[in-house]
């Protein structure tokens, strides 16, 4: 391992003597420099994987050893048990299953898969996860129910609000129509007053005479009066 020394200028490697008796000069070391012999060796993924623990996190080795011994014991029992049907068509009944076996099993019958026995720690962890999932589902159902109730309660209020808005729009539209009618009546009545002034000038013997456009305007007096009468009848004006 490389030996470092430190002075006022920083870290350095002291001078060393070669086998032939000559000396190597001291060398300065930059910050972050790692000597070649101290660089960690490369390890492949297979080697890193082999170094990982074989047991699940949190599982005691004693419990895993007991489960392994139990499994090996069952495998030895299964291997020591004689074959059920050593000869095709020959049925052998053992003392422990004579009452249950009444007929030979089909030759192509598939063996039932044995349920995997989990250690107590993994079994408790699985039960806790199932309980958490059930609690999350219950909370989600409650939120959905509350949201549905809130929507049902807000629907009548939305209907009332929409009806009020429609009524306000209708009132505003009616007010605009009434305002337009009043403006039109004022314009027509103003024209009638102007026509009456033109008629007075026509009856007068002195003063300026009306021009051709004013005379044409005076001829429309009856038409304008009829229009005023129709508007007053339709709008309720007096």
Swiss-Prot record:
UniProt KW keywords: Coiled coil, Cytoplasm, Nucleus
Per the record, the domain of life is Eukaryota
Q: Which regions are flagged for Low complexity bias?
A: 136-155
Quote the SUPFAM superfamilies the UniProt record gives: Pym (Within the bgcn gene intron protein, WIBG), N-terminal domain (SSF101931)
Q: Where in the cell is it found?
A: Cytoplasm; Nucleus
Coiled-coil ranges from the UniProt annotation: 176-233
Chief localisation class: cytoplasm
Against InterPro entries, the record matches this protein to: PYM1, WIBG_mago-bd, WIBG_N_sf
Q: Where is the composition biased (Basic and acidic residues)?
A: 65-77, 123-133
Lyase in keyword set: no
| Disordered as annotated region, ranges | 1-183
Q: Does the keyword 4Fe-4S apply?
A: no
Q: Which GO terms describe its molecular function?
A: RNA binding
Biological process (GO) annotations held by this record are:
exon-exon junction complex disassembly; nuclear-transcribed mRNA catabolic process, nonsense-mediated decay
Cellular component per GO, a single term: exon-exon junction complex
What does the subunit section of this Swiss-Prot or TrEMBL entry state? Interacts (via N-terminus) with mago and tsu/Y14; the interaction is direct.
- Give a short account of what the protein does: Regulator of the exon junction complex (EJC), a multiprotein complex that associates immediately upstream of the exon-exon junction on mRNAs and serves as a positional landmarks for the intron exon structure of genes and directs post-transcriptional processes in the cytoplasm such as mRNA export, nonsense-mediated mRNA decay (NMD) or translation.
Homology family: Belongs to the pym family.
The identity of this protein, by name, is Partner of Y14 and mago
Q: Which organism is it from?
A: Culex quinquefasciatus
């Amino acid at each position: 391992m490389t030996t470092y020394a430190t002075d006022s200028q920083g870290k350095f490697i002291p001078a060393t003597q070669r086998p032939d008796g000559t000396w190597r000069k001291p060398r300065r070391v930059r910050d972050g420099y790692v000597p070649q012999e101290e660089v960690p060796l490369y390890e492949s993924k297979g080697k890193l994987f082999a170094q990982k623990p074989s047991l699940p996190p949190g599982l005691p080795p004693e419990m895993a050893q007991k489960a392994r011994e139990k499994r090996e014991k069952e495998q030895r029992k299964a291997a020591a048990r004689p074959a059920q049907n050593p000869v095709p068509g020959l049925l052998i009944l053992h003392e422990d299953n004579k009452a249950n076996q009444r007929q030979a099993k089909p030759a192509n019958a598939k063996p039932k898969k044995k349920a995997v026995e989990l250690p107590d720690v993994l079994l408790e962890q699985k039960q806790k996860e199932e309980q958490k999932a059930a609690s999350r589902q219950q909370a989600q159902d409650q939120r959905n129910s509350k949201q549905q109730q809130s929507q049902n309660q807000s629907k009548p209020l939305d209907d009332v609000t929409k009806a009020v808005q429609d009524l306000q729009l209708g009132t505003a539209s009616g007010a605009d129509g009434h305002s337009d009618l009043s403006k039109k009546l004022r314009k027509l009545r103003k024209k009638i007053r102007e026509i009456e002034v033109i008629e007075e000038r026509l009856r007068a013997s002195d003063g300026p005479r009306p021009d051709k456009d004013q005379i044409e305007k005076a001829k429309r007096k009856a038409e304008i009066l009829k229009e005023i009468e129709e508007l007053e009848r339709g709008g309720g004006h007096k």
